[in-house]
Regions:
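SAM-dependent transferase fold signal centered on methyltransferase-like domains
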Residues: 1-127
């Protein structure tokens, strides 16, 4: 299993069945993907891997997480689909603090990178 040092162009979120089966290490190795963090179960790659069993997103921007960022983010992203992986706040807590409404074409992933840095990753669905 390879762990990424920096985010690349694409973000991969495995189907729930894959996570429950425990095959998340195998899929990363076979498809040459980099894991964001040991406990995040999110992956990244430079080039698109269309065979991935799950959702694929194109990374648009990455924000370093802070309380100040949450308050400012609503002005730029009033509506988004939020997901958390290996992150101290729940989706409900993030929504409450940021006032970002559910829906739209933007997907925000709140997660922790291998370095321990907490980030929000702005993406749009690719596949």
């Amino acid at each position: 299993m390879q762990v990424c040092q920096t985010l690349q162009n694409y973000l991969y979120e495995p189907h729930a069945a894959l996570l429950k089966s425990g095959a998340f290490k195998l899929i990363a190795t076979r498809l040459n993907l980099f894991k964001l963090h040991r406990h995040s179960h999110l992956y990244t790659s430079e080039s698109l891997c269309q065979d991935f069993p799950g959702r694929i997103f194109t990374i648009e921007e990455t924000y370093e997480f802070s309380g100040k960022l949450l308050k400012q983010l609503y002005r730029h992203i009033p509506k988004a689909n939020l997901t958390t992986r290996n992150f101290p706040l729940t989706v409900a807590e993030l929504r409450k603090r940021s006032n970002i409404k559910e829906g739209g074409d933007i997907y925000l992933f709140a997660t922790t990178l291998y370095s321990g840095q907490r980030v929000l990753i702005r993406t749009h669905k690719t596949h």
